[in-house]
Amino acid sequence: MSSAIQVAKTATYLPDLVEVQRGSFKWFLEKGLIEELESFSPITDYTGKLELHFVGSEYRLKRPRHDVEEAKRRDATFASQMYVTCRLVNKETGEIKEQEVFIGELPLMTERGTFIINGAERVIVNQIVRSPGVYFKDEQDKNGRRTYNASLIPNRGAWLKFETDKNDLLHVRVDKTRKINAHVMMRAIGLSDNDVLDKLRHPEYYKKSIDAANEEGISSEDQALLELYKKLRPGEPPSVSGGQQLLHSRFFDPKRYDLGRVGRYKMNKKLRLTIPDAVRTLTPEDVLSTLDYLINLELDVGGACLDDIDHLGNRRVRSVGELLQNQVRVGLNRLERIIKERMTVGETDSLTPAQLVNPKPLVAAIKEFFGSSQLSQFMDQTNPLAELTHKRRISALGPGVLTRERAGFAVRDIHPSHYGRICPIETPEGPNAGLIGSLATHARVNEYGFIETPFWKVTDGVVDKSGDPIYLSADLEDECRVAPGDVATDADGRITAELIPVRYRLDFETVPPNQVDYVQLSPVQVISVAASLIPFLEHDDANRALMGSNMQRQAVPLLRPERPLVGTGLETQVARDSGMVPITRVNGEVVFVDSTQIIVRDDQGVDHYHLLQKYQRSNQDTCLNQRPIVQQGDQVIAGQVLANGSACEGGEIALGQNCLIAYMPWEGYNYEDAILVSERLVRDDLYTSVHIEKYEIEARQTKLGPEEITREIPNVAEESLGNLDEMGIIRIGAFVESGDILVGKVTPKGESDQPPEEKLLRAIFGEKARDVRDNSLRVPNTERGRVVDVRIYTREQGDELPPGANMVVRVYVAQRRKIQVGDKMAGRHGNKGIISRILPLEDMPYLPDGTPIDIVLNPLGVPSRMNVGQVFECALMGWAADNLDSRFKIVPFDEMHGAEKSRETVEGYLKEAAKQPGREWVYDPENPGKIQLIDGRSGEPFDQPVTVGRAYILKLVHLVDDKIHARSTGPYSLVTQQPLGGKAQQGGQRLGEMEVWALEAYGAAYTLQELLTVKSDDMQGRNEALNAIVKGKPIPRPGTPESFKVLMRELQSLGLDIAVYTDEGAEVDLMQDVNPRRSTPSRPTYESLGVADYDED
């Protein structure tokens, strides 16, 4: 194919897409960890004799025990040991002991921005939280009167809330406790009446609060401290010293109260203070300025304004580094307590730092964070895009923030300040909608954790693109007039239009070019990476674009990937930044290439090795495989792609296939979004994917002796063991079906398991028969495939095994899955459906030149869903690309080149395609984009011309093989005795309340009765029914369902005398079913009962 044609000209270069992860972790190693260690120095014992100092700047990390691949293979954590220099100072003798102490293991980030924890790749998701600082809000009381309040929110510590009331009095609350007169608080802090009144711009309003305090008899600092103690610690005897200590520890102790760098920055900015950055606790000045601002709000003077808590200027992002820093602080807090106890207990003279520092609390805190925090997630590795999006995800859930249930509409909604920072499209459907978002393409997180987006400066109507773009946070952007990225400019960068739409203070207005301050970098900077891969995005409805971006993440990597004919130009960078494609770091020559490694020799003659992944299993069971695209002797330059990864072709991301598509109904097979496909997709393996399943078995130490992995399995035919080696483990390359043995294992049987005749034989002959039972690992139902890898772990090899296990064997089975009926497919515009039928090639509709159509979609799927982008992509651009033998790159939002630009561009290319000899049928001026198709079955043309083209269609990970399931007899729930639910439990299909109504509506009494009894939880009845079916006898009448008995027992346990009686008044014993079957006569069957018997009943 010829090279790609770039249609719309705009900045398509994006910044490094994983920088948000890597940059944050780098900050943690260089600054965050040192900050934490030094904030805990010195730790002093209770007598003040001993001091322990951590020299944070001198910490060091040891080389990790395993590299990344080895850690994955051994189920280990890719981590490094942390050592820090500690100094123990004895104040009495002046002696100083210095020692390097081990303080724990720190998981390290891989180059791709992930962590390997116990062999699994995990991602730490960015969390978006309310920024610490001061917030002013208004509330309406019951009478509709507006009152104002100010909240001082620290990074950690107690909240302080000032509020006004209807009597113009000021109150304060500490951590949502009872109200306290604001002036009591001021006096307790140590401010006199005049101190306060001098600082306020409207002291007359505050005087009422002073009078109220005087009336209560609180006129001095001591009285104020007593009052404060009473309110905060009711029920305890108040004292002045207690009040002082309480106040200090709540607001002025750096260990208990911390505004953080961000909180101090926000506070200074909002209240126009000049307090230095290093002061992280509250100061009297903070409190006074807050009061002053609140009074100005109440009186509506001085330019005071309320805060919008959903504005991105008031929300910040916590990335890996900061989350990890908080976790280290938790660990160090626990460690500090232990150190103080050990200082008190130990002999002062002989103590060393190593004896004091116990690494366990820190290790536990870090382990807990990576292993079980809500923000540490198992990486979505379905394809490279899923991986990349996961690392750029922003979550409002997690510890210390919202829960799904509490989040209202305001938090979830799109806010004007999201523009260019958080994608307005990509968010999950369902309960998490709006709480989980994705970083926009050009956005970055600044040092304070606020999201910034880049702009070009505009001076007198000329866009200056000479230097680097200017990054602005949401706060700064509010004060500027910002034009969109698609404004038309001439060659000198002068804006050509007379009036430009701009955003200013969260609103839209139109201004002349000389009033514009900034211009956006690119039209794509508003949306996320996944959304930016959708061509003609601007012609899609937002709901469908959302589904389109989410479904691209679920596309399965195919056996033969193909890049899209119509792309947006960002495909290359997505593939590179996902880490799926190996890239050379140096200029040089390729000196060696095979399927497993590429060696590049640089200009200095140094060899650089690039190992390729071959058929490895991803977290989602898809296949990770890399194929070289360079040849021996090629010259390469730094940054060049050396090999294709899974779902990549030519260094671009390639999630699906370009298929020939027609929009037309076909015999009802594409009713309700169903998809009709041609047999060609199966035959030519267009949508065949490789899936690798992992099976694991442990040989454990039991009470009766060790389990053994062996080939000697009791009661198994020799042919079933054909593919096992002498140890009883399947050989690599064997093809296995469901039920085949993968690893033979026998477990010792207990004495009680022996039948009496065997005990007799053993008593007579003293013959110790091999009393073991078969406990082998077998291929589960519905699974099959080829064994691609076997891994054996034993303690002798130095592997870490679970407690009680002597050996662990893992078998990897790969299967090729062709596309089949029931699989889910989708386009990039949210047009999804299930395959309803695979039609032979000769029956498919075909083009005038005889080419059969690949996929037939329903035209009714377009108008109501308003995702017209698919028509532009398929029928127009894709069709032109196919006929011109080229690929197009179209950046979304092209109206800057003129109105109706998409249609013009597309029609121009279609006309060009029709000029080729013998292809005049490609473009019909009467019906542009439509073609007269011919029915493959009859050879007759269809009545109407049909929209035909090439569209990019993906196969999604929701495969029918993983979902189809049937049950005959299986496990039952312990209490209700009903079948379990779900495929994993081999469960049954639930017949719910509404299904019962449906059967009742038709009067299907017998069907309903057996569904609720014999087929569900009538224990005796189901055994008898099975017996009757096996022996070919009539099925007996059903008995009482077990769940009814459970209900009876539950009511009886509440003390209700409830029982079942016959017409004669005799109580029926429902528990008689439990008695052995031998003593009770079998139940009558329907056939054995005469009419007379029914009357008796």
From Swiss-Prot:
Q: What reaction does this enzyme carry out catalytically? A: RNA(n) + a ribonucleoside 5'-triphosphate = RNA(n+1) + diphosphate
InterPro entries, sorted: DNA-dir_RNA_pol_bsu_ext_1_sf, DNA-dir_RNA_pol_bsu_external_1, DNA-dir_RNA_pol_su2, DNA-dir_RNAP_su2_dom, DNA-dir_RNAP_su2_hyb_sf, RNA_pol_bsu_bac, RNA_pol_bsu_CS, RNA_pol_bsu_protrusion
Task: Could you list this entry's UniProt keywords, alphabetically sorted.
Answer: DNA-directed RNA polymerase, Nucleotidyltransferase, Transcription, Transferase
Give yes or no: UniProt keyword Kinase. no
* CDD domains cross-referenced by the UniProt entry: RNA_pol_B_RPB2
- What is one Gene Ontology biological process annotated in the Swiss-Prot or TrEMBL record? DNA-templated transcription
| Subunit-structure text | In cyanobacteria the RNAP catalytic core is composed of 2 alpha, 1 beta, 1 beta', 1 gamma and 1 omega subunit. When a sigma factor is associated with the core the holoenzyme is formed, which can initiate transcription.
User: In which family does this protein belong, per the annotation?
Assistant: Belongs to the RNA polymerase beta chain family.
Q: What is the recorded function of this protein according to its Swiss-Prot or TrEMBL entry?
A: DNA-dependent RNA polymerase catalyzes the transcription of DNA into RNA using the four ribonucleoside triphosphates as substrates.
Q: What is this protein called?
A: DNA-directed RNA polymerase subunit beta
Naturally occurring in which organism (per UniProt): Synechococcus sp. (strain RCC307)
